[in-house]
A protein has these predicted regions:
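C-terminal catalytic histidine-bearing segment of alpha/beta-hydrolase fold enzymes
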Residues: 244, 254, 258-308
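N-terminal cap/lid segment of alpha/beta-hydrolase-fold proteins
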Residues: 4-73
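Mobile cap/lid helix-loop segments that gate and shape the active-site cleft of serine hydrolases
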Residues: 43-52, 198-233, 239
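Acidic catalytic loop of the alpha/beta-hydrolase fold
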Residues: 202, 248-252
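Catalytic nucleophile-loop/oxyanion-hole region of alpha/beta-hydrolase
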Residues: 89-91, 95-98, 112-150, 289-294
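Short beta-strand/loop motif that positions the catalytic acidic residue
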Residues: 237, 243-245, 249
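Primarily recognizes the serine-hydrolase "nucleophile elbow" in alpha/beta-hydrolase
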Residues: 134-207, 225, 295
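Short beta-strand element of the alpha/beta-hydrolase
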Residues: 75-83
Length: 308
């Protein structure tokens, strides 16, 4: 990975996207709670400069999953929740760019879009959690379609999308939507969590202001802060967790990963954390090239292999 050029990565991303298949998380396309939301879906494409092929979406009304399937599945699936400050979802930097590396090792990736907490959905701040719970249950129900073991489905999240993933790992059994079909009889608990430069806490000392604003507003109650500070929602049943962060992250402070590590360790949850001196925020795959942090996919895949 260290010697992969940006142009090679772009080519592999485009090939992965061309092969991918997308389907809705909710049966009618739109989420049940979207009926009261005024937002309109918008896809923004950026195909210029060094950040070429960097799509993002806003105004999501119904979550979708894009499947990046390997030639030889190893039975493990990963539901991916990309970041975007709880304002948008980036599709490539923390989505399609992962496919060449994880598919090569047999991992099937399911990159999802999800609704924003500030877009006026009936579930409010829990709209993203409703989407990711439903997504995990749907993947379990359909695991055979992709030659997967339903017990080996985990979640990987980045930045604000990491908060979505960590919400799934700590709040998987909370009823945030009404069951609509047999898929909802499945467990939403992921087999493992992989959290990359993740927003964890809502406490002001180390929070990410943009994500906090979108999730709980500017004047949250103490209960709201506790409810969405995921280091305070950890239990002994929280899945094994992999944490990755750059110490020089100027947006989401590295202390987010540190407090999550401490909370997991205190309750005996298996946890591994990798901190790198350099990387800034949002390095994903592309911006990690040429830095020591570029080894992170290999580290993560080796760790996953010990947990499933």
């Amino acid at each position: 990975m260290k010697t992969l050029s940006h142009s090679d990565l772009l080519q592999r991303m485009e090939e992965a996207v061309a092969r991918a298949v997308t389907f809705p998380v909710w049966p009618t396309g739109e989420a049940p709670g979207a009926a009261v939301s005024p937002v309109t879906f918008h896809l923004e494409e950026n195909h210029t400069g060094p950040s070429a092929f960097d799509r993002s979406v806003t105004g999501v009304r119904g979550a979708q999953i894009t499947v990046y399937a390997p030639e030889k599945p190893n039975g493990v699936g990963i539901l991916v929740t990309p970041g975007g400050s709880y304002r948008r979802v980036v599709l490539d930097k923390e989505g399609s760019a992962l496919a060449p590396f994880f598919n090569a090792r047999g991992y099937t990736l399911f990159v999802m879009t999800y609704r924003m907490p500030g877009d006026g959905h009936a579930e409010g701040a829990d709209a993203p959690l409703a989407d990711v719970q439903r997504a995990m249950r749907l993947l379990r129900a359909r695991a055979n379609e992709w030659h997967l073991d339903a017990k080996k489905l985990g979640v990987m999240g980045f930045s604000a999308g990491g908060h979505v993933a960590a919400s799934l790992g700590t709040r998987y059994d909370e009823a945030v939507y009404t069951a609509i079909d047999d898929a909802d009889n499945q467990s939403a608990r992921p087999a493992f969590m992989a959290l990359v430069y993740t927003v964890i806490t809502m406490h002001k000392e180390i929070d990410h202001p943009g994500s906090r604003h979108e999730l709980i507003g500017d004047t949250p109650t103490a209960e709201q802060i506790h409810h969405y500070s995921l280091e305070e929602r950890v239990s002994a049943d929280t899945p094994p967790t992999f944490l990755l962060h750059a110490v020089d992250d100027p947006a989401v402070k590295v202390e987010n990963s540190v407090v999550m590590f401490s909370a997991l360790r205190k309750l005996g949850v298996p946890v591994e954390m990798h901190l790198f001196e350099q990387g800034q925020h949002g390095f994903g795959i592309r911006d990690a090239l040429g830095l020591p942090v570029a080894v992170w996919p290999e580290l993560m895949m080796e760790w996953i292999g010990t947990k499933v």
